[in-house]
Amino acid sequence: MIKTFVFTCSLILSVVSFAGNNDSVPVYNIKTTVGDITVKLYPETTKHRDNFIKLADKGYYDGILFHRVINNFMIQAGDPKSKTAVKGAALGSGDTGYTIPAEILYPQYYHKKGALAAARQGDDVNPKRASSGGQFYLVKGKVLTEGMLFSIERDKQRKLEKDLFQELIAAQKEELKKLQLKKDQTQIAAFNDSIMGIARQKIREKGEYKLALPIRKDYKTIGGIPHLDNEYTVFGEIVEGINAHPFS
């Protein structure tokens, strides 16, 4: 079965055909002004797959722009306001009006070059990492060295510790409030250090954050954006046209 629809992006992204090689792995051909890009949607991320198909079939992406293009990073689309935007207009705030529960399946799916992922609001307002209903991005990224990957692993480890620290602090907020009322900065610092020590120990008991060898190989050969792994839902990938600008 083949379906046709169009979406345009400031490159200009216009999606054109849907052709499934089987029912569980739909494939979409995205026509742009600089070349065609074909993506497949992963069967395991069912909510994101079904949502993308629904929006594409009803023409949501017809004539839409790639409103965010960052060299060596990614290109992003899905703002319906871009269909009628004048030159120079600020874009990125438009969406479907709903979100999709996160389907983060790292390390099965990750931000290698060509990955298709859902945009979302930041953790400060979106701690459950729910995805945008309509906005998505395609990963360009860059090839990384072993040293770069080591730094990313170290930063990821620290973020895990910090996130757990925040959870543990939240569970001890009454105790912390008592110390704050006393205005004893020494005790407050000691309390925070104690909680951070617990967080670090718990994270280390699970093992250090390390990229699996196949993932490491991809980031050192084709490239990607590893610092976004386990943060955003990756729900597909480019299967043809990865060398179309700006992916070349």
PLM regions and their residue ranges:
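Positively charged n-region of N-terminal signal peptides that target proteins for export
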Residues: 1-4
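Cyclophilin-like peptidyl-prolyl cis-trans isomerases
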Residues: 17-248
